[in-house]
From Swiss-Prot:
Source organism phylogeny: Bacteria, Bacillati, Cyanobacteriota, Cyanophyceae, Synechococcales
Function according to Swiss-Prot or TrEMBL: Bifunctional enzyme that catalyzes the enolization of 2,3-diketo-5-methylthiopentyl-1-phosphate (DK-MTP-1-P) into the intermediate 2-hydroxy-3-keto-5-methylthiopentenyl-1-phosphate (HK-MTPenyl-1-P), which is then dephosphorylated to form the acireductone 1,2-dihydroxy-3-keto-5-methylthiopentene (DHK-MTPene).
Catalyzed reactions: 5-methylsulfanyl-2,3-dioxopentyl phosphate + H2O = 1,2-dihydroxy-5-(methylsulfanyl)pent-1-en-3-one + phosphate
Family that this chain belongs to: Belongs to the HAD-like hydrolase superfamily. MasA/MtnC family.
Annotated EC: 3.1.3.77
Pfam families in UniProt: Hydrolase
One example of a Gene Ontology biological process annotation: L-methionine salvage from methylthioadenosine
UniProt pathway: Amino-acid biosynthesis; L-methionine biosynthesis via salvage pathway; L-methionine from S-methyl-5-thio-alpha-D-ribose 1-phosphate: step 3/6; Amino-acid biosynthesis; L-methionine biosynthesis via salvage pathway; L-methionine from S-methyl-5-thio-alpha-D-ribose 1-phosphate: step 4/6
Protein name: Enolase-phosphatase E1
Cofactor(s) needed: Mg(2+)
Signal peptide as annotated in the record: none
Keyword line: Amino-acid biosynthesis, Hydrolase, Magnesium, Metal-binding, Methionine biosynthesis
Subunit structure: Monomer.
Cofactor binding, note field: Binds 1 Mg(2+) ion per subunit.
């Protein structure tokens, strides 16, 4: 089971390409699709998240928004832009970002950037009958878009399972136990690869084997007590 950012895809593609694209297109997208029931539900969900947000900067932003005579779209965009800026995980935001990126991929504005060895390693795993799964903080829709729009074509058929934060927090061991049940695979037979020490800890606590993705450019560079790999092809040394 693989994380995406910092594991199969450079963090720079997400931080320097995908996030800025969603940021700049967010308000226009919401205005264009505001009559769509699904989009309105996501706006409502984001409002509920904002009202429950205990972060001081978020509360201050909400207070200012309520005092202004701005439209609902302008107000909620200020919060969503804030979440993007501080890289806060939000299910509503992730869903909206995925929809914006879909339009970007379909228009040809975006093309996924994966590590050079990623596709070859994934294909080799598939050929050896390993079950491949994704667990990322990005929405499942966004995950599939990333693997569908690569320079080498659609790679989504390589994966059997897709999981995002709607399954559970990636830093909580219960999430990994639930994923094991969903895949119908004993937890001790799952190997999880991530660039996050906290995620590796949570997965290991659930009973999974873990590998820390130690790539140049990743925010975290200390695997602590976890075994680390510097390229995805290196994980074959740890497979049963």
């Amino acid at each position: 089971m693989l994380d995406i950012e910092g594991t199969t895809c450079p963090t720079s593609f997400v931080s320097d390409t995908l996030y800025p694209y969603a940021y700049s297109h967010l308000e226009g997208f919401l205005n264009e699709h505001r009559e769509n029931n699904e989009i309105q539900s996501l706006i409502d969900e984001a409002w509920r998240e904002w009202q429950a947000d205990t972060d001081a900067s978020s509360k201050d932003l909400l207070s200012k928004a309520l005092r202004k005579n701005s439209s609902e779209i302008v107000n909620i965009c200020s919060y969503l832009h804030h979440l993007i800026t501080i890289d806060r995980k939000s299910s509503a935001l992730k869903d909206l970002q995925g929809r914006i990126w879909r339009e970007g991929y379909e228009k040809g504005d975006l093309c996924s950037s994966l590590y050079p060895e990623t596709i070859e390693a994934l294909r080799k795993l598939k050929q050896q009958d390993y079950v491949l799964a994704v667990y990322s903080s990005g929405s499942i829709s966004a995950q599939k878009l990333l693997y569908r729009h690569t320079a080498d074509g659609d790679q989504t058929a390589l994966f059997s399972h897709w999981f995002d934060t709607r399954t559970g927090n990636k830093k909580e061991s219960r999430s990994y136990s639930d994923i094991s049940i969903a895949m119908n695979i004993p937890v001790e037979k799952v190997l999880f690869v991530s660039d996050s020490y906290a995620e590796c800890n949570a997965a290991e606590k659930s009973g999974m084997s873990v590998l820390f993705s130690l790539r140049e450019g990743n925010p975290e560079q200390d695997p602590h007590d976890h075994k680390a790999i510097k390229e995805l092809c290196c994980l074959f040394d740890y497979l049963l």
